[in-house]
Amino acid sequence: MQAIYAALVTLLSLSSVNAAACPPAGFASKSGFNQAKFFDGRWYAIKQTPVVYQPVNELFCVTADYKLETTSVCKVFRCKDIVVRIDNAANVGGVNGSRKKAGLNGVIKDPFRPAEASVGPRFLPSFLYGSYWVIEAGSYDELLAGKTQFTTDNYEWAIITGGKADVPTAGGCLPGVGRLNAQGFWLFSRKPVVSDDVMEKLVALAASKGLDVSALQPVAQEGCKY
């Protein structure tokens, strides 16, 4: 009986430690973020976690087209929301599958945290949108050079999460597992296909942020017609 009690105490202790470790220490959206450069043009998902609205059979030719529609205007201590138009698309079942599209809006409410947005279908009110954080972004050259601080706004890759990575997993932390409005973990690139070196360093960088990279699935981009 004492052995069983001791085992339960140990399990509870480990659970508490794991829970306390997520989100990882220092986990935050990117500082010094240039939203005008990031939310402009096409991004390609090269790895991501499957989510309810984009399951494994839709991880083909995934793209996100961004256009910044309004910028922040502040008057008398009140700021107008920044709005981003987002057009997502993916092929279903394979690179030659039918194209599935979704029109979304992104809203940035805090001009002092420009890398944190809320994203959702255009037909929904913004208070129902889910979190979207740009955790890090930079150039391929910076990444390949092994830098840990990324200062350029020549954004060629990005690590994105559905907000805080507050759910402990066997391999680290993930955002909002099981919560529709706070799901997702993506690796984005301006090119549909990247070198093995870029992929390895990008995955390693995401892991260094405390994210569970074992949850990432590859997104097929070779052979796609967008």
Where are these regions (language model features)?
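Cleavable N-terminal signal peptides of Sec/SRP-targeted secreted and luminal proteins
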Residues: Q2-A19
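A beta-rich soluble binding module of mature secreted/lumenal proteins
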Residues: S15-Y226
